[in-house]
């Protein structure tokens, strides 16, 4: 469960390391984002000489959450931390590699490029 001001790790090689959620997309009164939801983030830490810079804003999709997420079959999934992958307006990842596992819920939300780049889908 991600809300405004939540800090997330970045799970790709776009150059950003830490981002902060500044908006949850999908409705004017929406408070929380779960697995597979798109958020607007501000880049707080970035490596020098990369595609994104500190202080820029970007869109990101949540790929891992520390809060457990209940699936339709009744099982739960949770991860050690909150992570996101930076995407462009066309919902394609900015980076060319994804680090760590991602949730299966991304497949239902049509993030196939992220699914194919991920080393493991849980």
Curated annotation (Swiss-Prot):
The keyword Signal does not apply. Signal peptide: none annotated. Gene3D superfamilies: Ribosomal protein L14 (2.40.150.20). CDD domains: Ribosomal_uL14 (cd00337). GO terms for molecular function: large ribosomal subunit rRNA binding; structural constituent of ribosome. InterPro entries: Ribosomal_uL14, Ribosomal_uL14_bac-type, Ribosomal_uL14_CS, Ribosomal_uL14_sf. NCBIfam families: rplN_bact. Belongs to the universal ribosomal protein uL14 family. Part of the 50S ribosomal subunit. Forms a cluster with proteins L3 and L19. In the 70S ribosome, L14 and L19 interact and together make contacts with the 16S rRNA in bridges B5 and B8. This is Large ribosomal subunit protein uL14. It comes from Sorangium cellulosum (strain So ce56). The lineage of its organism: Bacteria, Pseudomonadati, Myxococcota, Polyangia, Polyangiales. The gene is rplN.
